[in-house]
C-alpha cells in the first residue's frame, strides 16, 4: 500500500494554483480496485480565458530571456523532479494503474526528456547565406513560435507531457497544457517542479471538458502552435480545428506496431524482449509491439515460447512489488479490449491467456495465435495487453501484410540478415524502426508517425524545430 496521500490538483494559471470553476466535476478512480480516489474540479470558460491572457503576457517576457538562462531554469526544475520521483511515481500508480517500477521509470524518462530540451535551448542556430549584392548580408533566424496549446493523454502522462513542456519552454514559448483528467495528480506534481523555477504564466496546467478546452484554446488568436498525443479520431478533429484557424499542429496518434521475426532470429531473446515491451503498462502504449509476423519455419516454437511467457506474467495491483503487469486504466478500456478479443476469437483466432484478479480493471495478457488477416485485431489498435501472431512464407509477404494497416508509428525487426534489414528499413511504413531491440523512442531522436499515426515529430532537433519559426533577413548597408 502507498503512504502517499492522494488529492486531485487545482489548476495552474498565472503561476498560482486555483480551483476550477466549472459546474461539472470528475471522479478519479484507482484502476486496481475501481474505488474513487478524489474529485477533480474542471476549468470553466472564464478559467480558460484567464489562462490565455496570462500565457500571452508570459510569452512576451519569456521569449526575451537568454537561452542559457532558460536552460538553467529548466535544469533546476528537472533536479526538483528527480528529487520528487518517489512521490510522483506513487501518485501515478494510484491513478493510472501501472506498476510502481514502471512509474519510477516514466518519471526518470520525463526528466531526461526535459533535460535534453534544456540543453538544446543553447543550440538553436540560424545561418548566414552568401550575399548576392556587395555591402549586404543575408541571414536566417530562428525564434519561438508563440504560446502553445498542448494536449497529453493518460497512458504515459509524464513522458508525453514532458515532450511538449520541454520543447516549448526551451524554445522560448509559453505553454498551456491540457493534461488527461484520468491522471491529474502526477502531471500536476511534475509541472509544479518546473513552475517553481519559471516566471509566472510560462507553464499553465488545465483540466476540463475536452471539447470545451480544445475549442477555446485552438480558436484563440493567442495560441500559435498546437501539439497533441492521443487517438486518431480526436487527432483528426483537432487537425480540422487547427486548419480552420491556420495553426501549426503536431500529431502523435495511434499505433499498431508490426514485428517481423525472421527465421534466423534468436527466439528466446526475441520473446523475452517483446513480452516485456508488449505488456508494459498493460499494453497501453502506441508503440507497443502487437502484430507479430513470424517466419513459418519457427512459428510454432515462437508461439509456444511467447504463450508460455505471457501466461507466466504476474498480474496485480501496481503497488505490489511482485506485480509485472497492472490493470488497464478504466472500465471503458477494459470493456473495449475484452470486446476486441472476443470478436477476434469469433473470427478464428486462437487465444492463449491467463487468469487475472476479479476486482479492478484487469484484462488477462493474451496472445492470439493463428489470426486470420481479416480478424478485427489485425486492423483495430488493441491499446491493451493483446498480441497477435501469424506466419509468413517470404519477407515480401511479411512487409506487405505489415503495411496493410492504416497505422505507421513504430515497427520492429528481428534478424541478422543485412538484406532483410535493408529491405525492411526501406519499405516498412513506420516513423521509427528498431532492429533486434526495443529502442524506438529516445530524447535525442525524432519520434513521430506516418499515415494515420500523425505527422510532425517530437524529441530530437526536429522536436525543437516544431516550436520555432524561421525568419529571413537581407540587409544592405
UniProtKB/Swiss-Prot annotation:
Keywords: Aromatic hydrocarbons catabolism, NAD, Oxidoreductase, Plasmid
Disulphide bridges, residue numbers: none
InterPro entries cross-referenced by the UniProt entry: Ald_DH/histidinol_DH, Ald_DH_C, Ald_DH_CS_CYS, Ald_DH_N, Aldehyde_DH_dom, Aldehyde_DH_Superfamily
Protein name in the entry: Putative 4-(hydroxymethyl)benzenesulfonate dehydrogenase TsaD2
Binding site residues for NAD(+): 154-155, 178-181, 230-231, 253, 381
Organism: Comamonas testosteroni
Residues the record marks as active site: 252, 286
Documented EC number(s): 1.1.1.257
GO molecular function, one term: succinate-semialdehyde dehydrogenase (NAD+) activity
First and last residue of the signal peptide: none
Family annotation (Pfam families): Aldedh
